[in-house]
Structures are given as structure tokens and as C-alpha cells.
Amino acid sequence: MIRAANGFRISVRNTAVCLAPNFRQLKGFSIINLGSLQYFRYNSVYSKSIRLVNTLENRIVPVYKECASPQSIGGKSNLKQLQWPKPPKNILILKKRMDERVDHCFETLVQHLQQTYPDICIITETDVAKKFSYLNLYTWTEISDLEQKVDAIITVGGDGTILHAASLFARSGMPPILSFSLGTLGFLLPFDFGSFQTAFADFYNSRSFVLMRMRLRVAMKTKLYNESIYAMNEMHIHRGLSPHMAVLKVFVNDKFLTEAVADGLIISTPTGSTAYSLSSGGPIVHPSINALLLTPICPNSLSFRPVLFPDTFKISIETSNKSRVRPQLSIDGRPLGLTDIGQRIDITSVKDNAIPCIIRSHKEDDWVSDIVSLLRWNHPFHRKGW
């Protein structure tokens, strides 16, 4: 017999006499009436209530409607309005790892959704579902199940959490994504977590606006991959730890452009223009512009500058037989392995599988104010202590 909180005694069979009047405060205990005695039983559903998404209804696909904008020339907006044919039910929530504050916010969010929207089913990663087993969460074993069941995505964390969400749908269309920050700076985080109740209510009731962020399709053939993979930010090919610079041939629409001798090359989306490409000297591109950005990483020739191509173009990169190193290929920061000499990688834009990101309002100038704030433009520089 084990003594528990509030005066309970728990037996080996998880049943004991109720000795405290406030027994209803304990989670996971059901009341059993046996004559004049009240017993409680610990419900195993609270300890092992992890279910699989393949038991849920199929995905609800929203409609994205064109909307007008008095701020734009011609009155046409680059944003779209989200319209659900019926309220979303299967919500995937992804959170930042190894952070107690994020854990608390995650629990608060899940409990609010379950209490306010009882028809909603919360899906999360397996280790998170085990850690918060008392919340009755769903998880998955096959990515294909996730692609077929998830109606919408919520992220709690930073830009990296959004990239992780995009990687889970790297071979399929992506549901709309609602992102919350916890005070950290990020180019992809429109909402502070303190506003999650209002933001989700607007999202749930089709009052949200969406910015469609284009993705890249990276077609390649390696020992591990022989298919196309989507990228939200960029793909880059880099010499890695080798002391030798990579020699890379670049083709545009199958026409030879240049043979670059550099640490590597970056092909990024407008969304990715504020990531690795920006650190390598690339320009900042508005996310509503559909374009491919080619940025060299520490090129041997100073004449090789970043180039912006239309999204209708195809960029191909091939490791030259002059290269003394097998460069490493990475997509959105995830290494995929070494490339072979003569291997070609084709990069194109993806229009039909863009990432629908929920934004704060229908005003398109939010991006301008966000850039000014995040990059601290127009802020004077001061020494600490002055």
C-alpha cells in the first residue's frame, strides 16, 4: 500500500478507499461506489493515453481567397484570406525542445484548446506525447499518416521550430501554420504567445489572413535520397571541414552560367533571404516575391555576386571534376550527405505547395516594420553604460 497526496492510499491494483473530501482535485481518478464506501481507481488512460493519428478523420483542406488591398497598386493584395469549409479538428502542435518555459506554454495552450474547443484533437511528437501523457495527445509513426490527417499546425518556439514543421511536410502540401514566439527575435514569428487565445479564435473562425511563402523543390540522387525534397529557407552546398575550396558548376535553364570556386553556394527562397543568405552578403527579398536567390559563400572571385532569378527558372549545381572535395548538401540546415563528382542537383520553385503562414493582420506593411525592428535599422549605436 502506497500513501498518496490528499490522504489517499493506492494499492497494487490501483484501487483504494477514499479518505479525503477533496478527492475530485486529483487527475485521472474515477469514483467507484461499493455499498457505503467510495473507492477511486486510477485511470490508465491518463498514464498511457497516447493514440495514433491514423484513427482520426482525414484532413480538412482550407480555401485561400483573394483579397483586395487599398495599400497596393491596382488594389490587389499579395495576401489571402483563410476560409475553412468546416472548423479544423486535427491540430499538430510543435514546440521548442529542452525549455521549461516552452513546456509550460505548451501545456497551457493544449488545455485551453481542449476546454474551449472540445472537438479538437491535439497531435504532437511521440516524446512530447509521452511526457504530457495526461493531456490525451495523439502522435504518429508514419509521415504519410501525418500528411493525410493534420488540418493545421501551431508552433511554439523560434524560427527553427517552423523549419522543423516544414521538414515534416517536405514531400507534400503543408497545412496552414500559426506561429507563436516567446520573446525571441525571429523573421517568421508574427504572434507573441500572450495573444494565443485571440489569434487561435480568429484562425479557427476563418478570420485570419495568410502569406503564402514559396518553397524550393530540390531534385537529386544520392546514396540516401532519390527524389525531390522541399525547402522553406534554402539549400546549400558547402565544402564542410575540408581545407580545399569546392569547385561547382552552375547552370541556369540548362545553360552554363559559371564555374564557382568557393566555400559553397546557397539557393534560397525570399523567406530564406534573411537567413544564411543574408549572413553571406545576399540581399533581403520580400517574401511575397516569387524568386530564386543564388548567393556564393566566400567566393574566390570578387566578381561573383548574388543573383536574383525569376521563379520560372531552373538552377542546377554540379560538382566539377576539378573539385578536390566532395561538398556536403544541406536543406534548411539539415545535412543530407556528401555529393559525388559530376552529380547534378536541380532546384526549382514550388508554386502549388507554398507554405501558408498566418500573419497578424491584413496590412502588408507589417513586414516592413518587422524588418526595421529586427535588424535595428535607424537605431543609433551606443556603447554599453553610456
UniProtKB/Swiss-Prot annotation:
Transit sequence range: 1-42
Chief subcellular location: mitochondrion
GO molecular function: ATP binding; NAD+ kinase activity; NADH kinase activity
One family name in Pfam for this protein: NAD_kinase_C
Gene Ontology BP term (one): NADP biosynthetic process
Gene Ontology, cellular component aspect: mitochondrial matrix; mitochondrion
Keyword set includes NAD: yes
E.C. designation(s): 2.7.1.86
Localization per Swiss-Prot or TrEMBL: Mitochondrion
Gene3D superfamilies on file: Probable inorganic polyphosphate/atp-NAD kinase, domain 1, Probable inorganic polyphosphate/atp-NAD kinase, domain 2
Annotated keywords: ATP-binding, Kinase, Mitochondrion, NAD, NADP, Nucleotide-binding, Transferase, Transit peptide
Keyword Glycoprotein attributed: no
Catalytic reactions of this protein: NADH + ATP = ADP + NADPH + H(+)
Function statement: Phosphorylates both NADH and NAD(+), with a preference for NADH. Anti-oxidant factor and key source of the cellular reductant NADPH.
Similarity comment: family membership: Belongs to the NAD kinase family.
Protein name from the UniProt record: NADH kinase pos5, mitochondrial
Organism of origin: Schizosaccharomyces pombe (strain 972 / ATCC 24843) (Fission yeast)
